[in-house]
Amino acid sequence: MSDLVKVTLPDGSQKEAPRGTPVIDFVKGQIGAGLAKAAYFAKLDGAPVDLSRALDRDARLEIVTTRSPEALEVARHDAAHVMASVVQKLYPGTQVTIGPAIEDGFYYDFARETPFTPEDLEKIEKATNEAIKADLPFVRSEISMEAALALFEGMGERYKVEIVKDIAAKGAKTLTLYKHGDWVDFCLGPHGPSTGRIGVVKLLNVAGAYWRGDAKNAMLQRIYGTAFFDKKELDAHLAKLEEVKKRDHRRLGPQLGLFTFHEYAPGAPFWLPAGTVLYNVLEDAMRRLVLKNGYQEVKTPLLFNKRLWETSGHWGKYRENMFLVVDSESDPALALEDRCSFSLKPMNCPSHHLIYRMDKRSYRELPVRYFTTDALHRNEASGSLGGLTRVRQFEQDDAHIYLREEQVTDEVLRIFELMKVVYGAFGLGFEATFSTRPEQRIGDDALWDRAEALLRKSLDATGLKWTLNPGDGAFYGPKIDMLVTDSLGRRWQTCTIQLDYAAPERFDLTFVGEDNKEHRPVVIHRAIYGSFERFIAILTEHYAGAFPAWLAPVQARVVTVSDRFDAWAREAAAALQARGWRVEVDGSSDKLGAKIRNAQLAKIPFTLVVGEKEVEARGVSPRRHGGEDLKTMPLETFAELMAREATAPF
């Protein structure tokens, strides 16, 4: 074995180094001090490693600097370790559990009987930033599972012991530890060179979290925080968080009269008049779009016998997420679960399969596209419910497409075209992820191989960049998920395209081919909005409640200088309403300034001022939401403006 290893750099050039040279020493000696100073971690043959890792083989080397978002993610994980060490120092007896980096920050879950207070958070944050300044190195080591178990048992860390036992049960022989100062934790890494490289930490809030996400387990305290290399970047992020709070749909929804919730129906929104208008506008727009693109609308029952779910596989794989209904004719002596022969449908696909199966199908008919907005019910854990983004009752712009295998790629491209129209209308950016087979699934590996290969080919044909999300597919097939980006740069999962070879087998779905023989179709499950509830939450925050004129529950409000102009105000509103616009009149006795201010607070796209000159001109003086005044114009001219700006774009 040679004493030298070949190191291939990103530009393709190669250098040699003595075997065992730490990455950081190689960078200092053969690339430059500037890169070494900026380096945070490295990648060897694509795998992330610490800068202290030895070059023990020929490999491709990439240095990740503090200019990279990937470095910031590692720094945030570093910050989680430092914060956890501080918490245990300040509050002896606190148990540590897990503490990953997450998008825009990090968290760590602690087991402690006494709740953390806002004052505690300030104290922890100050001590964390002081610990960072100590510039302690992160030291990596590997120990046997037996030694790891003895270590954490000796420390009294029962949650860590549980995790170590689980890792050992999966066949692992060693465990990676990271230590800074006298505090140690296990994780895969990598970590930065030392605590001093982390930057500045800000702790955000404390929330409850069940151990391992299971409500049957102990409730822990989760401290959320974030970290940035530069304080200016942190300040900008905190300003963004303040804007996020202002836009929170849970705040704006009730404020704008869109929706509310009640304890008698947890997880099921009450749509108020304004919200119902918004909901219906979105639904009607999608309906128009899909019906002119070859879809047929159907409606199916909400309640089904369990035999349907046994056929589909949901009874065995998804029952814990279903609302079960007792059969009134069942034996009262049976256990409650055994008396539940029915359930509310958690998804539409099985009932659509029944419709498809009702007729003999020819290859000439395919694709057959069924669309619905039926209500669905899923028994989500109460602790996971949150506003409109996680609910128990919802509707989707749901469609199921039955087609031949060779039609799949073209159909996926058609769906992407619809998606571009919809997301483009709202100014939402988007990107794709490809999710492959999960551990819990139906269908054999051969079917999954075909399904994944075909959906991957279809995704490649769209020309979009995408990322792999292994193991996150539906239990019946792989899927493409779309992540839309809102006006604050946040990503939300919405559209899904799922490929299903299993359902045609389970439901005995067929079509007669050109050879006059029966064949199995392929099924595509797809939704573009996702759920209406979640999409409305996204749009509410995207627009900060100031919806575009075509979508706004009230498109224009007429306000008068005084009540002597009420007659023309009502006549003008009625004329606009007759053309289909959503217009109302402020008939209050408030002064004009208050009326305008109230319309602005209600985020109505157009406020139409009516006074003496408007009555004489039989017109209005429009003011856009946000304050832009338009000149006085005849009512007909404003109606033409509405036709341009308030007509649904799809």
UniProtKB/Swiss-Prot annotation:
GO terms for biological process: threonyl-tRNA aminoacylation. Pfam families: HGTP_anticodon, TGS, tRNA-synt_2b, tRNA_SAD. Residues 3-65 form the TGS domain. It is found in: Cytoplasm. SMART domains: tRNA_SAD. It comes from Anaeromyxobacter dehalogenans (strain 2CP-C). GO terms for molecular function: ATP binding; metal ion binding; threonine-tRNA ligase activity; tRNA binding. Its main location: cytoplasm. PROSITE patterns: AA_TRNA_LIGASE_II, TGS. Keywords: Aminoacyl-tRNA synthetase, ATP-binding, Cytoplasm, Ligase, Metal-binding, Nucleotide-binding, Protein biosynthesis, RNA-binding, tRNA-binding, Zinc. It is an enzyme of class 6 (ligase). HAMAP family: Thr_tRNA_synth (MF_00184). Its EC number is 6.1.1.3. One of its GO terms (cellular component) is cytoplasm. This is Threonine--tRNA ligase. InterPro entries: aa-tRNA-synt_IIb, aa-tRNA-synth_II, aa-tRNA-synth_II/BPL/LPL, Anticodon-bd, Anticodon-bd_dom_sf, Beta-grasp_dom_sf, TGS, TGS-like. Catalyzes the attachment of threonine to tRNA(Thr) in a two-step reaction: L-threonine is first activated by ATP to form Thr-AMP and then transferred to the acceptor end of tRNA(Thr). Also edits incorrectly charged L-seryl-tRNA(Thr). It catalyses: tRNA(Thr) + L-threonine + ATP = L-threonyl-tRNA(Thr) + AMP + diphosphate + H(+). Belongs to the class-II aminoacyl-tRNA synthetase family. Residues 248-548 are annotated as: Catalytic. Zn(2+) binds at residues 349, 400, 525. Its cofactor is Zn(2+). Homodimer. Binds 1 zinc ion per subunit.
